[in-house]
């Protein structure tokens, strides 16, 4: 009976010692958080292992993640996977559908990225357009108009300048034949008669004002179709056209005139652009939106993946994944790290404590046997 008591006692004592030792060892991984001193001598095992090696642990974790987990090769493969392609394309499609559904305007789109488009157009647009026009004038002011116009346009004008005669004569004939033309001729005759006085009064003894106006009108209409009159008009137009082509830009417009035109043109362009920017994109450019939805989403997804893949090495160097993880771990409170590790390895830590009790009990059993027989 005595022997059994000794064995049981030794088992209990051994189990307590083994279990408590493991519990203390586990606690010493985390505690204390700071070193303790007695008369300038640091107490051994303070701080605990994890607080003491915290920076080394953070460095090693960052190294392992960068070199073995989130590697450039792995991320590149993931980027080029069909799943990533579909995810990016789906995201682009959602944004395009939102553009159509919400009737978003260009101004609303730019405001989402903190750009006041109207202010940009008013402050920078006017200045930029006027500056570009003035630079163009300074650079080309001594060149002829013909040299500044596109060759195709000059060729077209050269071939069709004679058509201006037909156009002018037709317009003149239509005007003279109209009620407005008749009225204007009568008004001019009244003015002429009033100015010439008695001489015209004598003429009216033979012809009425109406007959004179009618004769003048018919003669003017006839002149619009007369070959010689048309030849004169053609010659005048051709000469003026050639003179216009041969003029230099600064002869056609001096600096002040061009500056005024540039200012007015820039104001018109920016005002027009500002008005258009308030219209929904789907209304302003329906064909472009259709193209975006049908074709661009896939192309844009491929472009994004391709560019990310090309610049992935540079991006990862800039991000510095290892340094980022190390910095983040070092910002964690030690209480949080302890809680995190215990949550992750709770089952294993309990097994270690249980193993301490079991091993201590086994050692106590053998010690009891030794105590009985020795």
Swiss-Prot record:
Pfam families hit by this protein: DUF445
Topology with respect to the bilayer: Multi-pass membrane protein
Transmembrane segments: 4-24, 354-374
Annotated Gene Ontology cellular component terms: plasma membrane
Alphabetically ordered keywords of this record: Cell membrane, Membrane, Transmembrane, Transmembrane helix
Localization of this protein: Cell membrane
rRNA-binding in keyword set: no
Keyword Transmembrane: yes
PANTHER family: UPF0754 MEMBRANE PROTEIN YHEB
Family: Belongs to the UPF0754 family.
Full protein name: UPF0754 membrane protein SAR1937
Organism: Staphylococcus aureus (strain MRSA252)
High-level lineage: Bacteria, Bacillati, Bacillota, Bacilli, Bacillales
């Amino acid at each position: 009976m005595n022997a059994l008591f000794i064995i049981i006692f030794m088992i209990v004592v051994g189990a307590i010692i083994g279990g408590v030792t493991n519990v203390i060892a586990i606690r010493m991984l985390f505690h204390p958080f700071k070193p303790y001193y007695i008369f300038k001598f640091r107490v051994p095992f303070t701080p605990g292992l994890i607080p003491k090696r915290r920076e080394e642990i953070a460095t090693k974790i960052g190294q392992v993640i960068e070199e073995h987990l989130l590697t450039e090769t792995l991320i590149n493969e993931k980027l080029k996977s069909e799943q990533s392609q579909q995810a990016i394309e789906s995201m682009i499609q959602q944004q395009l559908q939102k553009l159509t559904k919400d009737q978003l305007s260009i101004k609303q789109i730019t405001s989402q990225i903190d750009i006041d488009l109207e202010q940009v157009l008013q402050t920078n647009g006017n200045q930029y357009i006027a500056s570009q026009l003035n630079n163009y004038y300074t650079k080309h002011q001594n060149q002829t108009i013909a040299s500044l116009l596109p060759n195709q346009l000059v060729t077209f004008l050269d071939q069709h300048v004679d058509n201006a005669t037909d156009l002018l004569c037709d317009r003149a004939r239509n005007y003279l034949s109209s009620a407005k033309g008749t009225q204007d001729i009568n008004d001019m005759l009244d003015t002429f008669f009033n100015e010439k006085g008695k001489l015209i009064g004598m003429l009216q003894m033979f012809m009425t004002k109406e007959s004179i106006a009618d004769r003048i009108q018919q003669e003017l209409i006839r002149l619009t179709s007369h070959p010689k009159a048309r030849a004169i008009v053609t010659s005048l137009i051709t000469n003026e056209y050639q003179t216009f082509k041969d003029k230099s830009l600064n002869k056609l417009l001096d600096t002040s005139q061009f500056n005024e035109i540039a200012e007015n043109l820039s104001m018109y362009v920016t005002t027009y652009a500002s008005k258009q920017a308030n219209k929904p994109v789907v209304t302003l450019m329906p064909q472009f939106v259709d193209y975006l939805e049908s074709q661009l989403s896939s192309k844009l997804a491929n472009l994004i993946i391709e560019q990310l893949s090309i610049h992935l090495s540079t991006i990862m160097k800039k991000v510095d994944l290892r340094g980022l993880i190390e910095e983040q771990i070092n910002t964690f409170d030690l209480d949080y790290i302890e809680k995190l590790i215990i949550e992750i390895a709770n089952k294993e830590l309990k097994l270690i404590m249980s193993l301490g009790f079991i091993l201590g009990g086994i050692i106590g059993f053998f010690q009891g046997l030794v105590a009985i027989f020795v």
